[in-house]
């Protein structure tokens, strides 16, 4: 496979995202006025409560069995490493560049969370279909590749709706607290850029001093922590993922809804149909937010460059090292396609679901759209270069 062929394959899912985003941006203009801010919020809630749980359940229940989970045990660890290392690098970007307070969680989340959904489902089978692919028989490669990609998508969704969800929510909560305390005057001013923001009025100092004297008991802290964990576990996308794992891993449940002779296959078909609305809706909302972001957002160029460096330079290098080390230690099956998927998980653009979270918590929506625009514009070239490197390593 030549560089130009790889560029074409890698560009297809990116171009799809950009085209649908342009449509969403047009629908949000004053000329069209179909995707107003209120409409985007309502559609976003549908994505969170209905579409995302459905796509996660449908993909997991259909493509992943108990044997697959056992055989591919390293993939959950690999995805966890991408989130852990990406989160650490994102935290360093925040510390070095000191962006606006409301962007802290967003930046860490975009550095940590890769788009393991539609991109993997398009890229992996496309690589299998090309002549000269190092992954053997085309039909076998495509079938196994789709299973790898679906499992990757489900794992990514699980991490995104627990780890990344918590990052964005915590950032939004902290920002609201700063606003309430008067430490932040407006969304466009940050503590360090405004010399008066740190100088509180006397009554504010007294209030904060009183608050500081109030000690929270250990029992209350543990209670709040457990409540927070349960809240994340019972988020609709997480429930969809858990149910998908249960149905996929339990043969008699799987046989009820999966397959031509399954008595309740209409349930799986209906859930799958609902799930197919996830990606178009998220992308349209992203495009709608982009219009407002280009008008009013002031994201530092250094922040965008920082996210791009983390996602397309540092993480892929770490990924090659992790996969090669795991292979040398005998932790991976001999299938080179499995190793390719593991490496690819480190080189993907940010997960689209982050824009859903930003909309859900009403924090940094415009900035999120601008960051996504630039990271996805760079993604085509980055994915092509890294796919070429990964294939050369595995050949």
From Swiss-Prot:
InterPro entries: Mem_transp_PIN-like, PILS1/3/4/5/7
Cellular component aspect of the GO annotation: endoplasmic reticulum membrane
Lumenal-facing ranges: 1-8, 67-73, 128-142, 254-272, 324-340, 391-395
Record's subcellular location: Endoplasmic reticulum membrane
Keyword set, alphabetical order: Auxin signaling pathway, Endoplasmic reticulum, Membrane, Transmembrane, Transmembrane helix, Transport
Transmembrane segments: 9-29, 46-66, 74-94, 107-127, 143-163, 233-253, 273-293, 303-323, 341-361, 370-390
Membrane topology term: Multi-pass membrane protein
Gene name tied to this protein: PILS7
A Pfam family assignment: Mem_trans
Highest rank taxon of the organism: Eukaryota
Protein name listed in UniProt: Protein PIN-LIKES 7
Tissue/organ expression: Expressed in seedlings, rosette and cauline leaves, stems and flowers.
Single GO biological process annotation from the record: response to auxin
Primary localisation category: endoplasmic reticulum
Family: Belongs to the auxin efflux carrier (TC 2.A.69.2) family.
Induction of synthesis: Up-regulated by auxin application.
Cited function: Involved in cellular auxin homeostasis by regulating auxin metabolism. Regulates intracellular auxin accumulation at the endoplasmic reticulum and thus auxin availability for nuclear auxin signaling.
Residue ranges, Cytoplasmic side: 30-45, 95-106, 164-232, 294-302, 362-369
């Amino acid at each position: 496979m030549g560089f130009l062929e790889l560029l074409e394959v890698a560009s297809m899912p990116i171009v799809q995202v950009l085209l649908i985003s342009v449509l969403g941006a047009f629908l949000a203009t004053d000329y069209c006025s179909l995707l107003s801010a209120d409409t985007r919020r309502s559609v976003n809630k549908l994505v969170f409560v209905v579409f995302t749980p459905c796509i996660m359940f449908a993909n997991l229940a259909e493509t992943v069995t108990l044997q697959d989970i056992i055989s591919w045990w390293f993939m959950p660890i690999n995805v966890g490493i991408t989130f852990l290392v990406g989160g650490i690098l994102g935290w360093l970007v925040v510390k070095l560049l000191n962006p606006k307070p409301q962007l802290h969680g967003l930046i860490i989340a975009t550095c940590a969370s890769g788009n393991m959904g539609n991109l993997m489902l398009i890229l992996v089978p496309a690589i299998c279909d090309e002549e000269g692919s190092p992954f053997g028989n085309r039909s076998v490669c495509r079938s196994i590749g789709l299973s790898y990609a679906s499992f990757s998508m489900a794992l990514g969704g699980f991490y995104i709706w627990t780890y990344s969800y918590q990052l964005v929510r915590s950032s939004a909560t902290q920002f609201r607290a700063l606003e309430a305390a008067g430490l932040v005057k407006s969304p466009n001013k940050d503590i360090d850029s405004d010399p008066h923001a740190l100088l509180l009025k006397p009554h504010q100092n007294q209030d904060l001093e009183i608050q500081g004297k109030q000690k929270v008991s250990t029992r209350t802290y543990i209670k709040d922590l457990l409540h927070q964990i349960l809240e994340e576990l019972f988020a609709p996308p997480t429930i969809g993922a858990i149910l998908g794992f249960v149905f996929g891993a339990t043969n008699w449940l799987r046989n009820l809804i999966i397959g031509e002779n399954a008595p309740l296959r209409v349930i799986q078909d209906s859930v799958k149909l609902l799930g197919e609305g996830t990606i178009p809706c998220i992308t349209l909302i992203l495009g709608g937010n982009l219009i407002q972001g280009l008008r009013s957002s002031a994201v530092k160029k250094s922040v965008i460059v920082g996210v791009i460096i983390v996602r397309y330079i540092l993480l892929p290098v770490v990924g090659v090292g992790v996969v090669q080390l795991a292979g040398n230690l005998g932790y991976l099956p001999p299938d080179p396609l499995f190793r390719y998927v593991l490496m690819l998980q480190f080189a993907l653009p940010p997960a689209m679901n982050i824009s859903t979270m930003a909309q859900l918590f009403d924090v940094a929506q415009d900035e999120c759209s601008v960051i996504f625009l630039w990271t996805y514009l760079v993604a085509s070239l980055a994915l092509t270069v890294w796919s070429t490197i990964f294939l050369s390593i595995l050949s």
